[in-house]
Amino acid sequence: MNEIKKKQIAILGSTGSIGTQALQVIEEHPELYEVYALTANNKVDLLIAQARKFMPEAVVIANEEKYAQLKEALSDLPVKVYAGAAALCQIVESGPIDVVLTAMVGYAGLKPTMNAIRAGKAIALANKETLVVAGELINQLARQYRTPILPVDSEHSAVFQCLAGEVGNPIEKVILTASGGPFRTCTMEQLKTVTKVQALKHPNWEMGAKITIDSASMMNKGFEVIEAKWLFGVQPGQIEVVVHPQSVIHSMVQFEDGAIKAQLGMPDMRLPIQYAFSYPDRINSSFDRLDFSKCTNLTFEQPDTKRFRNLALAYESMYRGGNMPCIVNAANEVVVAAFLRDEISFLGMSDVIEHTMGQVSFVQTPTYDDYVATDAEARRIARELICK
């Protein structure tokens, strides 16, 4: 009997929430998957522990100041150790790699994702900012190099699964569900005084700090709307957001005959991660199952874009196109970092993003170099606005 060739996986951002859960998936299926490379930004101690456990071919620490510590700690293992942004971009091109999981946070994921696509690697996309910033460019590259992009976000994985078997059937609407976050029922007055401690308590999902704040402000859902446009080839007007506090229905697709397909499951990121790894197959898992006897109250409501302006700003950037989503992403990364340092209020984040949108040079048909310049300019302006 022929032995199944194990898929070689590279995880960009292995020490974050998605990365650690991806390693749980791999650990559950050692007969199918093998870790080829692990990368991290700063969490060197966790990266060391992961390397010792999973014995990858190589590890990369983006922060070059941590290189010596990493190198010394792994000196007794046959693991290659690299550091820096350039190494991050090069490691994804390694011949044996089959799948690159892009689980890095923010704009930093763009360049390595582009390199992985050019190298013909299947992309398990968890870094939504890549498509927010440069969706058109990424799609062009994916077509050129015939590289599959498999969504890892639970919502986009849900849509992806709903579209299985529907080739040629026109989509009328993509319906992305949102939990509404921890402040769903808060008044504008209450939102003025919310703290980072409150914002970091998501009701349903275990996530990293940045995406948890984005979920609280609904910018995460705005980014997911933009991501859906590029992943599924739909127009902005075909993407609807519905608040579904229980997070049981992960998203839906409505077809031209009015029929709606939905994907349901437990709010567990390991499920979409595993599907991205195993696609087009489904494989067994030990993860919790949905108990319908406990799903006695599934509710839906419209998002309030007056209280959660970030969702409206994301839609506006998508309609305007060009480098505008890149501007919004850069400004958002700056304001979220400032909010986590207690330098800006929760509602103040939207003000800075909106003003940044009005001040950065607009480019209708941006190149990669335009995105780089836009990101730098938007960050500078957002920081200046925070300091005023």
Curated annotation (Swiss-Prot):
NCBIfam families according to UniProt: Dxr (TIGR00243), PRK12464.1 (NF009114)
| Source organism of this protein record | Bacteroides fragilis (strain YCH46)
One Pfam family of this chain:
DXP_reductoisom
EC number(s) given by UniProt: 1.1.1.267
**Chain's role:** Catalyzes the NADPH-dependent rearrangement and reduction of 1-deoxy-D-xylulose-5-phosphate (DXP) to 2-C-methyl-D-erythritol 4-phosphate (MEP).
Q: What is this protein called?
A: 1-deoxy-D-xylulose 5-phosphate reductoisomerase
Q: Which reaction does it catalyse?
A: 2-C-methyl-D-erythritol 4-phosphate + NADP(+) = 1-deoxy-D-xylulose 5-phosphate + NADPH + H(+)
Sites where the protein binds NADPH:
T15, G16, S17, I18, N127, E129, G208
Q: Encoded by which gene? A: dxr
Keyword terms of this UniProt record: Isoprene biosynthesis, Manganese, Metal-binding, NADP, Oxidoreductase
InterPro entries from the xrefs? Answer: DXP_reductoisomerase, DXP_reductoisomerase_C, DXP_reductoisomerase_N, DXPR_C, DXPR_C_sf, NAD(P)-bd_dom_sf
User: Which Gene Ontology molecular-function terms are recorded?
Assistant: 1-deoxy-D-xylulose-5-phosphate reductoisomerase activity; manganese ion binding; NADPH binding
Per UniProt, Mn(2+) binds at D153, E155, E224
Cofactor (UniProt): Mg(2+); Mn(2+)
- Which family would the database say this protein is a member of? Belongs to the DXR family.
Recorded metabolic or biological pathway in which this protein acts:
Isoprenoid biosynthesis; isopentenyl diphosphate biosynthesis via DXP pathway; isopentenyl diphosphate from 1-deoxy-D-xylulose 5-phosphate: step 1/6
Which GO biological process categories is it annotated with?
isopentenyl diphosphate biosynthetic process, methylerythritol 4-phosphate pathway involved in terpenoid biosynthetic process
Sequence positions that bind 1-deoxy-D-xylulose 5-phosphate: K128, S154, E155, S179, H202, S215, N220, K221, E224
